[in-house]
């Protein structure tokens, strides 16, 4: 198919930093940094909004987890502030904080247009010499004795040194072609779009993304 014709086009496009794995935190930090520069480097609009995000804690276990994750983020250079209820209201004046013990405010978070980001990545890849083949289904992959990979497509076979499984929702099927079980499960998410909310518009600033565990 075309680029972004699968699940990408209707993704939320949220770019978070908050994660407890050091290696994944490094990847998140790199990705967020890349998205802030991608439009300038490629000329392709990405819709980046660096609005930050607040993740809320409702019990002591979550508070303890927030302290742990902040330690991880400090190691990779991602800015994270642990806020009390009054401080949360300063960042997000419209948020009702009753019942919350703490908020983890990651200032480098944001959101993008997933389709725009994908197209920008494609532009950057082509600028670096990559070739992109559209509407060309992969039907099989084979590991050759040389250590190279043979990728069988509907329009011919490609031999490559490295094969990256970036099939998204279909990565399990692509993994099976190589005899690999990919531990991935698809999940259904919901979102709704609202009309303009006068109270939000009156603030004249973009509010951070809020993650409520309840």
Each language-model region and where it sits:
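Short beta-strand
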Residues: 8, 45-49, 183-185, 210
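Residue-level detector of anion-binding/catalytic polar loops
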Residues: 79, 131, 181
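General beta-strand structural signal in soluble alpha/beta enzymes
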Residues: 81-84, 132-134, 165, 211
